[in-house]
A protein has these predicted regions:
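Catalytic nucleophile loop of clan PA
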Residues: 201-221
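Soluble, acidic/polar mature domains that operate outside membranes
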Residues: 35-53
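A generic structural motif
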Residues: 10-13, 87-89, 121-127, 193-200
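Short, low-order "capping/linker" segments at domain edges
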Residues: 49-71
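Short amphipathic alpha-helices in soluble, non-transmembrane regions
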Residues: 23-36
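Serine endopeptidase catalytic core focused on the charge-relay Asp
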Residues: 66-184, 213-215, 223, 249
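Short glycine/threonine-rich beta-strand-turn micro-motifs
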Residues: 1-25
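Short solvent-exposed strand/turn elements
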Residues: 93-96, 186-206
Length: 253
């Protein structure tokens, strides 16, 4: 569910199996319009909204105790508590992770905390080395410095943002919603309408936790996606201002 501020229309995303074709969609839209008092549009999107699966080749690698197979996510931004610098990724990634360097070296990370409920999907890891306030963006072998950030209240529908994922690389697209509520119990229960959704165009398992940015400005961390017929319809991210208390983005002044 999301609100289009350009038209004032409330957009409801329904799974195809939950409604009876075009007739059912129009009937539901009319009923909800009468209840809400604003225009409502019902669209069929994907059969499932999901946290991006942690799989495929990537930079942050780990496994859960219950499963033997390896999972892969994408590292996000460097954060600090005022004393320690640490690395972020998504909370739904494994707790035990290794950072994979350019030469293939596995660097063990130490979990400092994970926040995976409601409006948050982030975990923070200590790294046994100094960390620069930088991230991979369009060029894999050259880091980009972080110089500022954009919070959710300052993000607008139609803004351009970019993201980098270990499975899909670098891509940019328009913000579709700034108050998106993913379907299902992906937020340790129903998700609040605090997620920012972007029009793809690329998202796959393994992109979870990756940085969302524009130039040197940090926007957030990738949480999940909504796909249609195997195509990335949109992905959504946690805004950087929802980092846990005591932690802030590291940036170059």
């Amino acid at each position: 569910m999301g609100l289009d501020p350009l038209t004032g229309t409330l957009l409801i995303l329904a799974r195809p199996g939950d409604i009876d074709g075009d007739t059912g969609r129009e009937a539901i839209a009319a009923r909800l319009t009468a209840i809400a008092g604003v225009p409502v549009e019902v669209r069929t999107w994907s059969e499932m909204d999901a946290n991006l699966a942690v799989e495929g080749g990537g930079r942050v690698v780990g496994s859960d105790a219950e499963e033997a197979r390896r999972f892969v996510c994408t590292s996000g931004f460097v954060v600090t508590d005022g004393t320690l610098s640490a690395l972020t990724t998504a909370a739904h990634c494994p707790d035990t992770l290794n950072f994979i360097d350019h030469d293939g070296t596995a660097i063990p990370l130490t979990l400092l905390g994970a926040w995976g409920a409601h409006r948050q999907d982030v975990q923070i890891h200590a790294v046994p080395m100094p960390l620069a306030a930088a991230f991979q963006s369009d060029v894999e072998d050259r880091a980009r410095a972080v110089t500022s950030w954009r919070n959710r209240a300052s993000t607008r529908v139609g803004d351009i943002v970019c993201h980098r994922g270990q499975r899909t690389g670098y891509s940019c697209a328009l913000v579709r919603f700034v108050d998106f509520a993913p379907a299902g119990d992906l937020c340790a229960g129903p998700c609040p309408a605090t997620w920012v959704a972007v029009d793809g165009p690329k998202c796959r398992g393994g992109d979870s936790g990756g940085p969302v940015f524009l130039g040197n400005v940090a926007f957030g961390l990738v949480k999940g996606d909504s796909t249609s017929r195997g195509t990335c319809a949109l992905y959504y991210y946690m805004s950087i201002d929802y980092l846990p208390p005591g932690w802030t983005l590291s940036y170059t002044r």
